[in-house]
Amino acid sequence: MSDLPEQLRAKVSGSSFYAGMRILPKPEREAMFAIYGFCRIVDDIADDETAPRTARAAALDQWRGQIAALYTGGDAGEAGFLAPAVHRFRLEQADFIAVIDGMQMDVDDYIRWPSYSTLDLYCDRVASAVGRLSVRVFGMERDAGIDLSHHLGRALQLTNILRDIDEDAAIG
């Protein structure tokens, strides 16, 4: 976790994923901590109901720019902690952007009563894209990894949605 900003280290170490990630070999562990940290940051932005939608959208746009800079050699700003994982495991920019785009769907409220195709797109962005990043870290063959990410990501995200349905209904 040495590449992670201090405040992010606390969030990662407090996560239920921490114990599982902690037993990975150091390069994979550090990469997974970075991926988790990124996901946590953009999810927190999307979920911050105290901030106006416009501010949350602007913060997500800033992250899009930082991710782009990470791949073009520009100033990646806060996203700089991802650089070691991106370079070592050849993580794809499109997957990071997909995660941000999924969070944007939360901000824009596109998933309150989605069509099947919108729900599928949302699951791809917020779950399968994370899976695609993860299978690269684990060294899985590309086609098999993409297939696994596709199905497992959707299954896990739909389970997450169903698990939270009562809580979400109470919120409105």
Which stretches of residues belong to each language-model region?
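Acidic catalytic motifs of isoprenoid enzymes
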Residues: M1-G172
